[in-house]
Amino acid sequence: MQDYKQPLRIGVGGPVGSGKTALLEVLCKTLRDTYQIAVVTNDIYTQEDAKILTQAEALAADRIIGVETGGCPHTAIREDASMNLAAVEELAQRHKNLDVVFVESGGDNLSATFSPELADLTIYVIDVAEGEKIPRKGGPGITKSDLLIINKIDLAPYVGASLEVMESDTARMRPTRPYVFANLKEGVGLDKIIEFIVDRGMLDAK
């Protein structure tokens, strides 16, 4: 019989540079005093994102595992999630009362999805700098993730993107699913993201 808790597993995906690691840093720093948190990061040949989170002091180093996927990072979160599942298990055994493990995918495209075996909830991050067309391009990350975050809204005027157009496209592409417009650098939208995690993840409100 296992002597540790099964944590809520939240997959965090999105293209390179969209703000996945920034999201994890701010979530860890905000939630770590209330909940027991750990993180698994995926990089192709390095443990760069794990190092970034450790250096930012988002969590203690023993709460972060960096998985080096080699080859295609999508496979490690979908078809063969064994390395990630093993990392989640290791963290759960190491910290027996974990509430949440975030699993950050390697930089992926709009078609990447998490295996249901690996993630109980999925958050997908895109950013305004990629252009206002991104939501209407669709793909499972846009249409099927449990929460979509449109990050870096402060850049809209500089890249000629209309947030109104992005919002109407997003609402059309995922009519029944939630989304948040955010500027994670400044903490804009963070309260809604945390509310989603606590409510949908059925975490005990503390």
Curated annotation (Swiss-Prot):
Which Gene Ontology terms describe the biological processes this protein takes part in?
urea catabolic process
Q: Which UniProt keywords apply?
A: Chaperone, Cytoplasm, GTP-binding, Nickel insertion, Nucleotide-binding
**Does the keyword GTP-binding belong to this entry?**
yes
Q: Which domain of life is it from?
A: Bacteria
Question: Which GO terms of the cellular component aspect does the record hold?
Answer: cytoplasm
The record's subcellular locations are: Cytoplasm
Record has ATP-binding as a keyword: no
Q: Which GO terms describe its molecular function?
A: GTP binding; GTPase activity; nickel cation binding
Residues at which GTP binds: G14, P15, V16, G17, S18, G19, K20, T21
Q: Name one Pfam family in it.
A: cobW
Could you say which protein family the record assigns here?
Answer: Belongs to the SIMIBI class G3E GTPase family. UreG subfamily.
- Fill in the subunit field for this protein: Homodimer. UreD, UreF and UreG form a complex that acts as a GTP-hydrolysis-dependent molecular chaperone, activating the urease apoprotein by helping to assemble the nickel containing metallocenter of UreC. The UreE protein probably delivers the nickel.
Q: Tell me the function of this protein.
A: Facilitates the functional incorporation of the urease nickel metallocenter. This process requires GTP hydrolysis, probably effectuated by UreG.
Protein name (Swiss-Prot/TrEMBL): Urease accessory protein UreG
| Species | Aliivibrio fischeri (strain MJ11)
Q: Give the encoding gene's name.
A: ureG
